[in-house]
Structure formats: C-alpha cells, structure tokens
Amino acid sequence: ACIVLAGCQADRRSANEALSDYVRQNSKAVGFATVNPTEDPVTARQLKKEVLDKDLRGLVLYCAEERFHPAHSRAMNLYEAAAELNLPIFFHNCPPFSQQAVMDYARPFQLDEIARTFPTLKMIVGRMGFPFIEQTWCLLGKHENMFADLTIIPQKVWEVYNLVMSAYEAGVMDRLLFGS
C-alpha cells in the first residue's frame, strides 16, 4: 500500500475530493484527508461523512503551517473522534516552512499529551519530525501508538543509514514507515 496525503491548502474540501477520486482509481493508494480542527468539523459523524464515506482512511494535520497547537482543545476533540473511527493521524510538520509557520507547533514532543490521552490512536510523525529528530526517538520509545516515516531529504547519504541504525538500537524498527 502507498499512503497519499492531501496537501496543505486553503481549500481542504477540494483537496480531499481530488484525493478521494485518486484513491478510488488506484487500489493500492491509501488516502489521508487534510483537516484543520480549528476550522473544520471534528465529530465522529462529520468525519465519517467527510473521510470514510469518501474512501479515505486517515487524517493529515499541518499544525505548524496552519498555526494551531497540536493539543488545542478542538484538536483533542478531533483525536477522540478519530480514535473512535480507527483513523490514524499523520502529523506533517516539517520543512520547508513558510514565514508564517509556527515552528513550536512542529516539535514532536507536543504529541506526547495526545499519545497519553488517546493510547489507541495511531499517530505518524512525518519525516521523522525533522529537524527535531531526537524528540521523535523519545516518542517512539515511549508510546506504542507512535510511528514515524523516513521520507526525509538528507543532506548526506549516510544520514538515513544512521536513522535506521538508531531505530534498530532503540528497538523501534517496527514503527518506522519507509517512503519517498
């Protein structure tokens, strides 16, 4: 399977519709709808209609770019609904950042409260949480519901090798997602 993320754009509904059309034509694609919990509906009923009924299977959040704290009260309501529907959350908070992005909201340690509050909610830290990779290692070691992907753009070829070796040494190889 291949996870395909809806992009970070002002018209999230159109982005999700386009992604829905794409995954319906590509059986190996697993679509993650974009949502901003401070602006979009966040109940289980609304998520079912806007996500599951469109053959999308997860949610992607752009906290830094859309300038909301990952543990904002409306975001916590979203996570509760996502856990109820078994929808994983992909946190795509990595470079390149716009000048308006709030980098503090990109820090993986901000996800600790969410992981503790919703231990069954599957969460993926995009691009290993770059540039805050050490925080991602801590989360992966602490929470069994945390995963990370390796779609980083390394400055040096050996950086990805070092990440994989660090995951092996930390005993979290089973929580890495490989991608490009």
Q: Where are the predicted features?
A:
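Active-site gating/metal-coordination segments in enzymes
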Residues: 7-102
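Residue-level signal for short, function-critical loop segments
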Residues: 6-7, 127
